[in-house]
Structure formats: C-alpha cells, structure tokens
Swiss-Prot record:
Protein name, entry field: Outer membrane protein TP0453
Span list, region Amphipathic helix 2: 56-63
Origin species: Treponema pallidum (strain Nichols)
Pfam families tied to this protein: TP0453
Annotated stretches, region: Amphipathic helix 6: 172-179
Reported modifications of this chain: Palmitoylated upon expression of a fusion protein with first 46 residues fused to PhoA in E.coli.
Entry function: Might be involved in ligand transport, alters membrane permeability at acidic pH (4.0 to 5.5). Incubation of the non-lipidated form with lipid vesicles increases their permeability.
Length: 287
C-alpha cells in the first residue's frame, strides 16, 4: 500500500514538474499583437500569402530542392498560413508562419549537434542560426524564418520588427486575402517586376518585357491551379503586341482595364507553378 502511494506520488510529482517546466517556458512567449507583413518588412521584390490547407502538394514541390528542405518542412507541418517576402538583391526569403508550434522545445528541435547556433535578442527572444536558414519561434502561435544567401538579413533585425513593424504598401485584394484568417485557400502573390515573372510563365525567360507590378491569385483545382492575373502595362506603344503575345500562349480570358492587363480563368499545373515560383529565388533565376 505504501509502495503504491509512493509510486502515485512520484508520478504526480513528475507530471507537475513537467507542467511547471512547460509553463515556465511559455511564460516568456511574445504576448503583444503581431503584424505578419510588418515583420517580413518593406522593399521586397515579391510578396506572397500562402494558406497551407489545400496547397500542401505545391509547397512540397517548391521546397523540394532547397538545402534546408527538412528544416523548412518541420515548420510547414505546423503552419496554417505563410506570409512571405523575397528580396532579389540579397537572395533571401523572409517568412512569417501562423500556426501551432512547439515553443517550449525549440532547444531540442534546433540543437547545436545539428548545426544550429542559439542566440537571444535584446528583448529576450531566442533564435537559431545555421548556414542557410535562421529560425525563431517567439510564441506558440507564430514562427519566423529567413533562408537564402550569406547576404541575408540577420534574424535579430527581423525580430526587431515585432516591436517596430515595417509594413509594405500592397494592393487591396492582396491585403484582403491576407486577412482571410484561414477561410480562403487562395494563394496570393504581388511581384514588383511583373515582366520578369510573366516571361517565365510564358516560357520565354530571355525576353525582356517593359511591364510594371503584377498581382496573381491562385486556387487549387485537382492537380492544377486556376488563376487570375493583373499586370501593370508600361510603354503604351507596345501594349497591343504584348497583349497579342500573351493571348497566343496562355489559354485564358484576356482584356485591358485602364493601364492594366487582366488575365482570368487561366490554368497552370502545380508542377509548372512550383517551377516558376522556385525560379524567382534560385541562383539562376535571381542572378
């Protein structure tokens, strides 16, 4: 009887200890409100909003050949939506993920033996650096990731924008998709140099089209994506040739509204879309 009571006490003490450990770990979590786009920052060449549900196959294809594929997948598996920015000059992606993360066990997940170096910001937020990728989980409901070249921004700088957000100015529809809070599965992209992206979509990567900013919205449908694209036209003298070229290559409804070329009901395979998106940050695509 005494032994049973002792065993019960030790088991209870163990449970309480673990609970206290977990509580003490989460007590230091970031509790203030967070602006995802303000954290990734302004001045990017590409912005994206990526709900994970319904788009898992596309995400797997995009990160398939990345050096930090396994580490990125750890984060994605716990993510409901990604807010991202790509910076061509420094060849880096900054990602803010909303979801459910193992905040209390980051030291076990991102261990020194696996090549991670642990550091803290002036606000006491822990982050982990490796050769290609830097990660921080400031709270159980969001994470921050930077991956890219050695010129990429330091994670401490990104985390400083939790306090002082640097929010980019983005189109109304893009903003609307970002605030859908998981109710939409639409992938949204805003690209500063629309000509660079559209030539890859047309499969004419060497063609230099004088085009402005582009908005792209994609919805998964079986193994392909249905998309709507809005492209700012540049030189009025060549607008018609550009419209003609695009209409000959893309199977979609195309028309002009003011200074914008609108492409609706276009389709693209998940494999092709992943290739085009990946080319935006690949060494070849971002040189």
């Amino acid at each position: 009887m005494i032994r049973r009571r002792y065993r019960g006490c030790t088991q209870g003490a163990w449970i309480v200890s673990v609970g206290m450990l977990f509580a003490s770990c989460t007590s230091g979590a970031w509790k203030a409100s967070v602006d995802p786009l303000g954290v990734v920052g302004s001045g990017a060449d590409v912005y994206l909003y990526f709900p994970v549900a319904g788009n898992e196959n596309l995400i797997s294809r995009i990160i398939e050949n990345h050096e930090s594929k396994a580490d990125i997948k750890k984060i994605v598996d716990r993510t409901t939506a990604v807010y991202g920015a790509f910076f061509a000059r420094s060849k880096e992606f900054r990602l803010f993920g909303s979801g459910s993360y193992p905040y209390a066990f980051t030291n076990l997940i991102f261990s020194r033996s696996d090549g991670w170096a642990s550091t803290k910001t002036e606000h006491g937020i822990t982050y982990y650096e490796s050769e290609h990728t830097d990660v921080s989980i400031p709270a159980p409901h969001f994470s921050c990731v930077i991956f890219g070249s050695s010129k990429r921004e330091r994670m401490s700088k990104m985390l400083s924008r939790l306090v002082n957000p640097d929010r980019p100015q983005l189109p109304p529809r893009f903003e609307k998709e970002c605030t859908s809070e998981g109710t939409s599965q639409t992938v949204a992209l805003y690209i500063k140099n629309g000509g660079h992206f559209i030539t890859k979509l047309l499969n004419f990567p060497q063609l230099n089209l004088p085009l402005g900013a582009m908005e792209l919205y994609l919805t998964a449908r079986r193994n392909e994506y249905l998309y709507t694209l809005s492209l700012q036209l540049g030189n009025a003298k060549i607008n018609f040739p550009i419209q003609f070229l695009i209409s000959r290559v893309l199977n979609a409804h195309i028309h002009v509204e003011g200074d914008r070329l609108i492409i609706e009901d276009g389709t693209i395979s998940a494999e092709r879309l992943a290739s085009v998106i990946s080319s935006l940050y690949s060494k070849k695509g971002s040189s």
